Amino acid sequence: MIMFRDEFNSVCNAAKGKMALLNNNPAGYFMSAMVAGAFITLGGFVTFTLGSILTAAGCTITKVIMAFSFASALSLVVMAGAELFTGNNFVMAAASFKKEVSWLDTLKLWVVCYLGNFVGAVILVALFQLGGVPKGATGEYFATIAAGKMGGTASTLFFKGMLCNMLVCLAVWCCTKMKTESGKLIMIFWCIYIFM
């Protein structure tokens, strides 16, 4: 008997469901991807705002608190059933390797999902800007974090992104295995804690 056969089949069935949604309701799929991008942006905004406040207060465990805070972003995505590119890398690749979904369909879904995530993130950033946030010390903190994240070489950024994506995929896999919503949330928090 193969370990985790049922869970792996659930992942493949989820991939087929994602493809069906994309094929039957492309606008609905794109909207779901936009929502995921907005949730990740919202989680990032809350995390970095919190980081700004804690850093200014001289907190010595700012990074630990920020890690737990950012886990809220993926929690929102998973619990709402939104379409996130990084999680879909695992789901769609698994189904493609099992030949449940074609690689061409997987690539199509990845492109649409990535674009939807990007558009959702940009819209939320625009809303933050129009709302006057972030500004002052918080805005400066955001700029410092962004500069630090983009300060590496292209290969360094690529491999860091790959490692982060592995942890998101692990969180998605753990959510497949967990039988309760609380179990899913706990595993998301642990995977994203490592990520940060």
Please describe what each predicted stretch is.
Residues 2-196:
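Alpha-helical transmembrane segments and their helix-helix packing motifs
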